[in-house]
Design a protein with these regions (language model features):
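Gram-negative bacterial Sec-dependent N-terminal signal peptides
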Residues: 1-21
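Short loop/turn motifs that connect adjacent beta-strands in outer-membrane beta-barrel proteins
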Residues: 21-36, 147, 224-232, 307-310
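Transmembrane beta-strands of outer-membrane beta-barrel pores
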Residues: 43-49, 154-160, 223, 239-245, ...
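Extracellular/periplasm-exposed beta-strand and loop segments of Gram-negative cell-envelope proteins
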Residues: 52-60, 66-75, 96-132, 158-214, ...
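Compact recognition or signaling/catalytic modules
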Residues: 230, 235-239, 282, 292-294, ...
Length: 360
């Protein structure tokens, strides 16, 4: 954004010098039968066309990491047994043992688990999409000739709703090895496997919101001739810059992500059983949300209709091939990064504009 402002300031600074140059294209004076400048204001409606892209997730638990289980409920173990393995006899043994331990497996018996699946995964059928939004648009033009102009598209940066799609689950798998004291009971290995629910993005509706700054710059060709044709179609091509700030996450989704942070923290702290039970750890997970800047080509078709030599109506439809990236990080001051999720947001907006302008 700073570079963009610098370019604009520089352009205004050299404009007086250009106006004195002997050139029919760069001048502050009227051209041959046409006005050099125009500005219009009106309604700008943005309709994103992109589809949700799968969210990519990483955690601090690497494949093959071994963690102590700590105290865990027998029912928790039974609910997470690998359904692809025949462990009926083991399940009966666990139930029998739980009868004498009040339903818990204490840390001296639960042993440890070798964990798989949480290092990285793709949450299929999930993603983020930008919602439609309407704002106040401002279009300014400088005409090199009666037919060729340079336009700056701007407006009041709107708050855009980011919609969540799908359900996120963690593909947890592990081999648990019970122990007596410090003696591992390798012959009693327990296969665990389950998709642990993390967040239902559909239930939250709006996952987040952000303020979108999307100035665009175009070279345009206007058909017809000033003073002859009241109705003048035009086409344009240029570049859009997208910058997002004031990002705010849905509190319910943030709570789900903090819970996921506690799960990873529990594993790192030697309480893998508490992770399966979604018990709070001693960590203090916080959630950070970021969105990357992006550039995109933009193309426009539109028209102007002259009321007189100064006032006119304008309408246009533009398309920008715009894609950004959103990063969600869950971290703790002591344990560092616990979970990171990245998602491409295909915005690809169609922009409809209708306004009234003035030439000078």
């Amino acid at each position: 954004m700073n570079k963009t402002l610098l370019c604009l300031v520089t352009s205004f600074a050299i404009a007086p010098a250009l106006s004195h140059a002997d050139s029919p294209y760069f001048s502050l004076k009227d051209g041959d039968g046409f006005k050099r400048f125009s500005v219009s204001v009106g309604a700008l409606h943005v309709m994103p066309q992109g589809k949700a892209q799968p969210i990519q997730i990483n955690s601090a638990i690497k494949n093959g990491d071994v963690a102590q289980n700590g105290t865990i409920k027998v029912d928790t173990v039974l609910e997470n047994l690998d359904p692809n393995l025949n462990q009926d006899a083991l399940a009966a043994t666990l139930k029998f043992l739980g009868f004498f331990t009040g339903g818990d497996l204490p840390s001296g018996i639960s042993g440890s688990s070798k964990i798989q699946g949480l290092e990285s995964w793709e949450a299929k059928n999930t993603g983020l999409e930008a919602d439609d939004v309407t704002t106040f648009g401002i279009m300014t033009n400088y005409f090199f000739t009666d037919n060729i102009s340079f336009e700056i598209k701007a407006g009041i940066p709107p708050k855009v709703d980011i919609l969540g799609k799908g359900k996120i689950s963690a593909p947890f798998a592990a081999i648990a090895t019970p122990q007596i004291g410090n003696l591992p009971l390798d012959f009693l290995e327990i296969g665990l496997k389950n998709d642990i629910p993390i967040a239902d993005l559909d239930a939250h509706g709006k996952a987040a919101e952000a303020r979108a700054w999307t100035p665009a710059f175009e070279f345009q060709y206007h058909f017809g001739k000033t003073g002859v044709n009241k109705f003048r179609p035009y086409v344009g091509i240029g570049l859009m810059y997208a910058y997002f700030n004031d990002l705010e996450m849905n509190p319910a989704l943030e709570k789900d992500l903090i819970t996921a942070g506690h799960m990873i923290a529990n594993i790192k702290q030697g309480n893998a059983g508490a992770a399966l039970e979604k018990t709070e750890s001693t960590a203090n997970p916080v959630v950070e949300l970021e969105a990357s800047d992006a550039f995109a080509p933009v193309a426009t078709v539109g028209f102007t209709y002259d009321f007189n030599d100064r006032w006119f109506a304008v309408g246009s439809v533009s398309y920008a091939h715009l894609k950004g990236e959103t990063t969600i990080t869950v971290k703790d001051a002591q344990l560092g990064e616990l979970v990171q999720a990245k998602s491409d947001i295909e915005i690809n907006p169609i922009l409809g504009y209708a306004g009234v302008g003035y030439r000078f």
